[in-house]
């Protein structure tokens, strides 16, 4: 074989000369397309025989792309059978004989890619024999290569499925590798275990007995000073902790001793120690019942506190110049994040132990320990929120003296800690405003800017959503202390004090008008003059404050300045997509719109252009391709994505404020946002795009009604087309969505679209699509639920529910909104479709692990009963019993509330269809009322459950009186004895039921026995504004007909109720 042409080709590709490389690439393409067999055979010969390292190393790299099944240049199927046989055979020989490690690994990569395509099709049985033989080779490199190959090929799902019956044989092979005399081979064998777990977690169970040998391997590598190899082994343990934490139950004591010893080892690399810590954190997440034991938790927490206390003792001048605390991956910062992670897994045990350590830390003579105490409180403030609340005032009292600490980094940590509390314990913090605001104000003039900035950040968080009267109480002090900071020569102080100042203005509101003329020129000056790269954020804060001041003082005061600011900003050169100012300016313009209302419409063009730019901003290609990229490009890509999400959110606000005036931009906005509903790099971008879509359809509908003169804007061709396209694309997107929070947003958007579209002309198409989505969503949510349940540590009775629980519940609720909206819009036409998913709904009502899911499913039944007509009533035998089973007094009050409400609706709407369930339902409802009334301390949920039960009883009595027979009088007496109710939500239903009885059964109701109770119920209903005009007429006629009885009974009412009725009679 003449190898010269291929040799010349390879040398040309490596020449470094652009022209030569381009010519060589064209020649290479010709070989691929027209002479693939010659190309492959030549590569094989060079790999096997060339003495030139370059000519041996380059062919495997090119072969990898030539045979890659995912590559468009794949030539595998075009090769002659004999070429393929040669390729397979010679590659295996090459691995055995290649002396250079990097070339051998390139050849192994080619074998792996080839095996991934051929093994599932049973076209390379020899490869398994090759792997097994290589694992017993006297050559260390070949033994290591065998395990590398196992890991590489088993990682493919098709190969894993094909080889699953042989996992037990692989386990024996791995066991052999773990006992190999070579540490390199041992670690390679250990690493394959994680690949088997990834490929098939259930079948991987055969590797569980190897845990002691795996741990022994890691120990040996540490003893042999092979830390990089040890780190690979620890990573495998982390993966096992994620997927199979149960594997460690019997061996955890041994694992803990080994890994904790590594943590304490002073001479080990940080990467090794941090990997061990990562293992403990992962294990705590999935097996908190073990990790929370004092034997394990307390030594780790003590070590972490020690690490945190090792914070760098840097020069205060240098520290003061930093934007944030030092964030290197040193022990101190790693410990801070680790304690935060632990607080979410073992909050109770962590808090109890920290309480023992806290006094020593907070009162230490060493500033680093005081700093550690405060920073630890900050890091656990979210995870231990429940525990902190029970000790909150005591905690604040214990740390308050540290506001005056002699060391500035402790004072910094004090305000940093308060800021964390303000984020996660907002109500508790704001209730202490009389204590905390003066402390903050007193220290706003700290000589160290970092402390002042930390204080300002705390104030900003603390004042968020605070009651305005609490801010107004300190208005003069706030303005007096913050105003000088706005003039500070340190732009960072100005920037953060502006943020706090904005929060103060937001709280003061219209009362800030008297200060408007003082502050607005100053803010405008910052906007116009602070144009350097360093002060971009300051400038952003300035326009943010301007917009918040505008909202506070109102359009009349702000209008002229607002218009001038809009015109000035619009004259500026366009910001780059990744400019941090974009966020501030776009949000400010949205507030301008909120302040000016329709007066903003002439300036809408100025804000829509940058919004569209942000929505369409290009994400760095390295992000899109999932490549490694620099911190700079990472930050740039993040800013672009944040701006996309923010711009989409802002357009939604414009839509709410300006409604049909936004119509000229609908088509362009729709085109930009619909492409982002499946945005793969940021769920927030996808969710905001999804949220915007229904608004755009609604704007179009409003436009054709307000401007086009149509009674129903949905009948406009443009709106109809927009609606159907968005519905179809949203439905298609939902079918492939697997993230619960994004799925929830998409389902809610589908519900909103249906609400806007109503009973559109494409009803059959919409119904068909909706139930395709519903069936798919039930399946997806069940998979997510199963995955969630598998990760719960059932042995930990103290475990808090993870955030995933709420996310899944929200997704079910969004699905319920879709199905409920179907019932509301399509009424009887929807019932046959609902019947197809009814078994899934009933199963969830009966077996779902979450009250919220059960309640969501009952809500669908409520909408079905209320809107489905006779076809829905015919389903009563299937749906009433499950609701009745949810009324047992020992169940969650919110579930009972939804169930009794549904039963009342069923009686009211279905009447005769409800008869078979009548007496049992009444008994169950009465049991609910009696049970709640027996509880001495009733919370809002219990009261709502009881009052809904009382309301349901009234619906049953008034709609099925003839079916109660002899029980009718005593049932009325019982119902009246439970009235009036406290829950405002059911007051209207109670009045409606009472008025029905007054109208139809006056002789039984308007009697000496009940008149006082009737008058009391009416007075309460009037006070709650729950009496509609028709009911008022019924009441008026009834009371006039019994004028003397009413007059005799009024004095038995409270003075308040007498006054209410007197006013009613007067009017």
From Swiss-Prot:
Keyword annotations of the record: Cytoplasm, Nucleus, Protein transport, Repeat, Transport
Record SMART domains: TOG
Sequence ranges of the HEAT repeats: 3-34, 42-75, 93-120, 125-152, 164-197, 206-243, 251-286, 295-347, 349-381, 385-425, 427-466, 468-508, 510-553, 555-596, 598-658, 661-703, 718-757, 763-826, 832-869, 876-909, 917-960, 969-999, 1008-1040, 1041-1064
Localization annotation: Cytoplasm; Nucleus
One CC-aspect GO term: nucleus
GO molecular function (one): nuclear import signal receptor activity
Biological processes annotated in GO: protein import into nucleus
Any Pfam family hit: HEAT
Family named by the database record: Belongs to the importin beta family. Importin beta-3 subfamily.
Function according to Swiss-Prot or TrEMBL: Functions in nuclear protein import as nuclear transport receptor. Serves as receptor for nuclear localization signals (NLS) in cargo substrates.
Protein name in UniProt: Probable importin-5 homolog
Organism: Dictyostelium discoideum (Social amoeba)
């Amino acid at each position: 074989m003449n190898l010269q042409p291929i040799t010349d080709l390879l040398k040309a590709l490596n020449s470094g000369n652009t022209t030569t490389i381009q010519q060589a690439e064209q020649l290479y393409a010709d070989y691929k397309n027209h002479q693939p067999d010659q190309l492959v055979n030549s590569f094989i010969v060079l790999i096997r025989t060339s003495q030139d390292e370059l000519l041996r190393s380059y062919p495997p790299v090119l072969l990898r792309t030539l045979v890659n099944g995912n590559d468009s240049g794949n030539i595998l199927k075009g090769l002659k059978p004999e070429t393929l046989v040669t390729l397979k055979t010679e590659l295996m020989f090459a691995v055995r004989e290649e002396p250079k490690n990097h070339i051998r690994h390139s050849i192994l990569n080619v074998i792996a890619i080839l095996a991934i395509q051929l093994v599932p099709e049973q076209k390379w049985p020899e490869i398994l024999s090759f792997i097994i033989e290589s694992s017993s080779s006297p050559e260390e490199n070949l033994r290591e290569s065998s395990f590398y190959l196992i890991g590489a090929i088993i990682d493919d799902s098709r190969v894993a499925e094909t080889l699953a019956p042989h996992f037990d044989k692989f386990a024996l092979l791995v066991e052999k590798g773990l006992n190999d005399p070579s540490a390199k081979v041992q670690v390679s064998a250990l690493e394959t275990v994680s690949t088997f777990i990834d490929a098939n977690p259930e079948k991987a169970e055969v590797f569980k007995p190897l845990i002691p040998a795996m741990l022994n391997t890691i120990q040996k590598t540490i003893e042999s000073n092979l830390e990089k190899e040890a780190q690979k082994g620890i990573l495998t343990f982390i993966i096992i902790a994620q997927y199979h934490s149960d594997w460690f139950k019997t061996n955890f004591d041994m694992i803990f001793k080994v890994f904790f010893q590594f943590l304490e080892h002073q001479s080990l690399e940080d990467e090794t120690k941090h990997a061990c810590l990562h293992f403990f954190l992962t294990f705590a997440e999935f097996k908190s019942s073990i990790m929370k034991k004092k034997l394990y938790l307390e030594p780790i927490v003590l070590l972490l506190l020690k690490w945190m206390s090792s914070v760098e003792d840097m020069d205060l001048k240098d520290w003061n110049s930093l934007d944030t605390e030092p964030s290197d991956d040193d022990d101190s910062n790693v410990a801070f994040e680790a304690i935060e992670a632990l607080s979410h897994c073992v909050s109770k045990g962590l808090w109890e132990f920290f309480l023992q350590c806290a006094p020593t830390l907070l009162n230490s003579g060493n500033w680093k320990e005081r700093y550690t105490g405060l920073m630890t409180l900050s890091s656990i403030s979210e995870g231990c929120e429940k525990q902190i609340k029970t000790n909150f005032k005591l905690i604040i009292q214990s740390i308050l003296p540290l506001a005056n600490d002699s060391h500035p980094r402790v004072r910094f940590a004090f305000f940093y800690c308060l800021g964390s509390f303000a984020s996660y314990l907002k109500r508790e913090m704001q209730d202490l405003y009389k204590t905390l605001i003066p402390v903050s104000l007193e220290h706003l003039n700290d000589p160290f800017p970092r402390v002042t900035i930390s204080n300002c950040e705390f104030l900003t968080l603390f004042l968020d959503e605070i009651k305005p009267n609490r801010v107004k109480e300190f208005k003069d002090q706030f303005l007096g202390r913050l105003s000088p900071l706005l003039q500070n020569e340190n732009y960072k102080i100005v920037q953060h004090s502006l943020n706090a100042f904005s929060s103060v203005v937001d709280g003061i509101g219209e009362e800030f008008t008297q200060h408007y003329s003082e502050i607005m020129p100053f803010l405008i000056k910052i906007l116009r003059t602070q144009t350097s790269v360093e002060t971009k954020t300051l400038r952003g804060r300035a326009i943010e404050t301007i917009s918040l001041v505008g909202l506070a003082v109102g359009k009349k005061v702000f209008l002229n300045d607002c218009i001038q600011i809009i015109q000035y900003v619009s004259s500026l050169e366009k910001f780059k997509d990744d400019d941090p100012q974009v966020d501030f300016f776009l949000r400010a313009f949205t507030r301008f719109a909120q302040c000016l209302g329709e007066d903003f419409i002439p300036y809408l063009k100025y804000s829509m252009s940058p919004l569209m730019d942000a929505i369409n901003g290009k994400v760095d290609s390295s992000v899109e391709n999932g490549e490694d990229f620099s911190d700079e490009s990472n930050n740039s890509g993040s800013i672009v994505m944040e701006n996309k999400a923010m711009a989409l959110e802002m357009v939604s606000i414009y839509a709410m404020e300006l409604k049909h005036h936004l119509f000229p931009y609908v088509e362009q906005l729709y085109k930009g946002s619909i492409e982002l509903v499946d945005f793969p790099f940021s769920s927030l971008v996808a969710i905001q795009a999804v949220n915007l879509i229904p608004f755009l359809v609604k704007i179009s509908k409003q436009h054709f009604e307000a401007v086009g003169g149509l009674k129903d804007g949905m009948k406009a061709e443009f709106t109809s087309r927009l609606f159907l396209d968005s519905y179809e694309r949203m439905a298609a997107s939902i079918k492939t969505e697997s993230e619960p929070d994004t799925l929830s947003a998409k389902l809610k958007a589908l519900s909103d679209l249906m609400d806007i579209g109503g009973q559109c002309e494409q009803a059959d198409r919409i119904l068909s699509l909706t139930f395709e989505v519903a069936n798919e969503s039930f399946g997806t949510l069940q998979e997510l639920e199963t995955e969630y349940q598998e990760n719960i540590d059932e042995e930990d009775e103290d475990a808090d529910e993870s955030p995933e629980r709420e996310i899944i519940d929200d997704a079910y609720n969004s699905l319920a909104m879709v199905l409920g909206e179907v019932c509301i819009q399509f009424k009887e036409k929807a019932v046959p479709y609902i019947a197809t998913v009814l078994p899934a709904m009933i199963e969830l009502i009966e077996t779902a692990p979450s009250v919220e899911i059960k309640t969501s499913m009952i809500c669908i039944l409520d909408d079905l009963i209320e809107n489905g007509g006779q076809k829905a009533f015919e389903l009563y035998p299937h749906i009433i019993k499950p609701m009745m089973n949810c009324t047992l007094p020992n169940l969650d009050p919110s579930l009972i509330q939804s169930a009794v409400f549904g039963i009342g609706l069923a009686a009211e709407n279905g009447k005769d269809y409800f008869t078979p369930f009548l007496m049992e339902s009444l008994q169950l409802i009465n049991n609910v009322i009696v049970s709640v009334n027996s509880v001495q301390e009733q919370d809002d949920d219990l009261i709502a459950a009881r009052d809904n039960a009382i309301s349901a009883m009234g619906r049953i009595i008034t709609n099925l009186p003839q079916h109660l027979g002899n029980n009718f009088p005593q049932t009325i007496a019982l119902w009246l004895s439970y009235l009036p109710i406290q829950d405002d939500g059911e007051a209207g239903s109670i009045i409606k039921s009472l008025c029905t009885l007054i109208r139809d059964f006056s002789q039984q109701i308007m009697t000496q026995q009940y008149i006082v109770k009737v008058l009391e119920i009416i007075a309460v209903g009037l006070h709650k504004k729950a009496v509609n005009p028709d009911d008022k007429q019924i009441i008026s006629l009834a009371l006039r007909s019994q004028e003397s009885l009413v007059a005799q009974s009024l004095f038995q009412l409270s003075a308040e109720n007498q006054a209410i009725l007197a006013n009613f009679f007067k009017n």
